[in-house]
A protein has these predicted regions:
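Protein kinase glycine-rich loop
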Residues: 20-27, 31
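Activation-segment/catalytic-loop signature of the eukaryotic protein kinase fold
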Residues: 86
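Conserved short submotifs of the Hanks-type protein kinase catalytic core
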Residues: 90-104, 108
Length: 541
């Protein structure tokens, strides 16, 4: 985006709703948490779409209107994000939706590892139920992928984003084939790439199968389903899916046979949704699932889900990261010859948040907003500061990923107890786990981040290199724009590394890796690389 901050229009005020943190962003839209004033316990997600900018990028008001109509028709299932209402003014389209309070599902899955089969079964079954419901409404999603799979406060899956959805069948009428080639290449069915028309319901089935594969092993099976072009997909087709190399060799035979039945390149032999629901691998009880196919033990599920997350900061981890990063560095350097990384990645959310942050310095994270005259801040002794830093950091579940697996269970139980009060704070929901804390001075912190990014081939010339040390010391927030490629998919990854002062009276910073475009697993992999290479900046409880 080329819009300057001074040109950005203010967000419309919504009656009876207070606006909170940004939880999603893009080139012409931003998603924020909203709190009902008359019912403070009720939180919603509010998506703001800038009409002029979206129109300029080829997304018309009419197209957005069609998406909203389809989404409204599909609202009503417990595993689909509900659409409450929407409206518009001369500048913005605003959409009030159900808030998936626990954020991205795939933000909580370790790349290259995945989750255990019981959890994968739980989420796959909920995904199939959601897709079956929208198909019953005559709608095909056509963009099932990790970016569009969220989870609520109880750990249940929520299918989101109907931007590419299509009405494939109206009441009592025959199916209509789709002809436009849309979706994310790793999750697209082969018939989308190769045919003149395809059954969008069966391409949804294929995408569900790829999602299941990723749940089980934490990586995509191929970059795109093009025979003779993609080596991994070609190998899969040549051997009829009967592969013995990693990660296929870690799956048991029953699961592998089921997955191959879902991922049949020939549509006529691929399992339908109805057949999938009746398959023995799917149609059995799950310890996390109640009779309504929803989560019955959120605490146990969250403990299990987070158990594989790990960011190692040992010398060996640094050595392995540097060794594994050489090819990735070349990939990024080559990619950035074709795109301009000389300007910040000014997603809509960054622009809006920058305006707010220019109006006031960071406020304490543990209390209501305070105003200090003449920048005279209250002073605390070192012991008090350490206790207050610990109080802030220890409440964040993201810190568990830096704890060794041996201490994970006891730490998790302790953290869950301390979360009781924290969860009652407004706008603390839907935060990502791709973040760490630091108690280093801002100048040292930014220098370490810059060096880490350079080591994996990411330019910072347009985001922070122009800032002097004096400039940095005056800032409570620093945004580092990111525009790179995913290591496995070779698809664009865009976002922002946001360095925020947690409390204006403490030298404590939260470094958040906020994705605006791309695969959540590959974004987490990027977060891990930068964090490991920034080891000396990471504060661990």
């Amino acid at each position: 985006m080329s819009q300057r901050l001074s040109q950005l229009d203010a967000l419309p005020k919504l009656k009876n709703i207070s606006i909170g943190n940004t939880i999603g962003q893009g080139s012409f839209a931003v998603v924020k948490v909203g709190q009902l004033i008359k019912n403070p316990q009720r939180l919603v997600a509010i998506k703001y779409i800038h009409r002029r900018i979206s129109n300029k990028k080829g997304v018309s008001d009419e197209k957005i209107g069609l998406e909203l109509q389809i989404h409204k028709a599909c609202t009503g299932h417990p595993n689909i994000i509900g659409l409450h209402m929407f409206g518009t003014d001369n500048t913005w389209i605003y959409i009030i939706m159900e808030l998936a309070e626990s954020g991205d599902l795939f933000d909580k899955i370790e790349p290259g590892v995945g989750i255990d089969e019981t959890l994968a079964h739980f989420y796959f079954k909920q995904l199939v139920n959601a897709v079956d419901y929208i198909h019953s409404k005559g709608v095909a999603h056509r963009d099932i992928k990790p970016e569009n799979i969220l989870i609520d406060a109880e750990g249940n899956l929520k299918l989101a984003d109907f931007g590419l959805a299509t009405v494939y069948k109206r009441t009592n009428k025959e199916k209509r084939l789709s002809h436009d080639k849309c979706g994310s290449p790793p999750y697209m069915a082969p018939e989308i790439v190769s045919s003149q028309g395809y059954d969008a319901t069966m391409s949804d089935v294929w995408a569900c199968g790829v999602v299941l594969f990723v749940l089980m092993c934490g990586q995509i099976p191929w970059q795109e389903p093009s025979y003779g072009v993609d080596a991994d997909f070609t190998n899969y087709v040549d051997f009829d899916g009967k592969l013995n190399e990693s990660p296929w060799n870690v799956f048991d035979s029953t699961f592998k046979a089921f997955l191959r039945s879902v991922l049949k390149p020939d549509v006529s032999t691929r399992l339908t949704l109805q057949a999938i629901r009746l398959h023995p691998w799917v149609n059995h009880e799950n310890v996390f699932m109640n009779s309504d196919n929803q989560c019955k033990d959120a605490e146990q599920l969250s403990e299990q889900l987070l158990s594989n997350l790990q960011v190692g900061l040992s010398d060996e981890d640094i050595h392995d990261t540097i060794k594994a990063t050489q090819d990735y560095k070349k990939l990024n350097q080559k990619y950035q010859k074709f795109i301009s990384n000389s300007q910040p990645a000014q997603d809509m959310a960054v622009l809006i948040d920058d305006i707010d942050e220019q109006r006031q310095r960071a406020v304490p994270a543990t209390q209501d907003q305070l105003l200090f005259k003449n920048n005279k801040l209250p002073s605390y002794n070192l012991e008090d500061d350490q206790e207050r830093i610990l109080a802030i950091v220890s409440k964040d579940p993201a810190n568990l990923q830096f704890v060794s697996p041996q201490l994970r269970v006891s730490q998790l139980t302790s953290t869950q107890r301390r979360l009781a009060d924290f969860k009652r704070l407004p706008f603390s929901r839907a935060e990502r786990l791709t973040k760490f804390y630091s108690i280093l001075p801002i100048v040292s912190l930014v220098s370490i981040l810059r060096d880490a990014l350079h080591r994996i081939g990411v330019s910072t010339s347009g985001s922070i290199d122009h800032l002097s040390n004096d400039d940095l010391m005056e800032l409570s927030t620093v945004n580092i724009g990111i525009n790179i490629l995913g290591e496995k998919s070779k698809m664009p990854l865009k976002g922002t590394i946001k360095v925020n002062q947690c409390d204006c009276s403490l030298q404590l910073y939260k470094i958040s890796f906020v994705k605006s475009k791309g695969d959540p697993l590959e974004w987490r992999q990027f977060f891990k690389k930068v964090t490991i290479l920034s080891r000396e900046a990471v504060y661990i409880e």
